[in-house]
Amino acid sequence: MKRIFLKLAVALVTFTIGVSATAIYWLYRMEDVELPAVATLDTRPSCFPGLSVRVLKSTAQTEFFPAVALSENAWSRSFLNGWYSRQLEAMNELPLAALEDEDESYRFLWLRTFHQPVAIHVWRTGVRHFMVVKRLNGQGGYEAGTFDLYWARSLSENDWNAFMMHLEHTEFWLMPTEKTSAMFDGAQWIMEGYREGRYHVVDRQSPDPGAYADAGMYLLRQSGLLADMPAKDVY
């Protein structure tokens, strides 16, 4: 009986060695196989540069809306430029083209006539992404007020890519800056963008549900501001 077990053990060891040797032999005989690359999201907008204008990036840049007509009407253009610029200045914001350390940046200015002004700024520096949220205690249609909320955090690559997809769906870089609206009260949804030396801004008043509104709402959700905000105040 012991001899039988001994023979079986020897046979098993011999078989195992043979299989291992064969596997190693064929492993070294195999040609190198190129593995498929991991799929990554191409975040360059398909509609870029679209209607954007070339603006030199410089810390000396002082105009928030350079070379951009916020309205075809001269009086409206001057009024809107002054209104929006005063709100941004109250938030200690700078023109996007003046931020030399940012490779790509976007700013959403949310001005509700009777509610607190909000600015959400997101940007990319290399492979890192960031968000800054500012809210004042005044009213978007009147005096800006002073800081009520101010915080910053990093954004994950997934969060950044999700926002890029929202901009892609709305064809942000191809959207006209102005769209005539007959509203007297409401909210201005102003989205600025700067990348590769080009600048674009879109201004809509209480936009209808759709891709552009979704892009703004995405930033508002990421900011956390909607968590304790009544639905009637979101317009």
Segments (PLM) and residue ranges:
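N-terminal Sec-pathway targeting helices
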Residues: 1-18
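Function-determining sites in protein domains
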Residues: 20-235
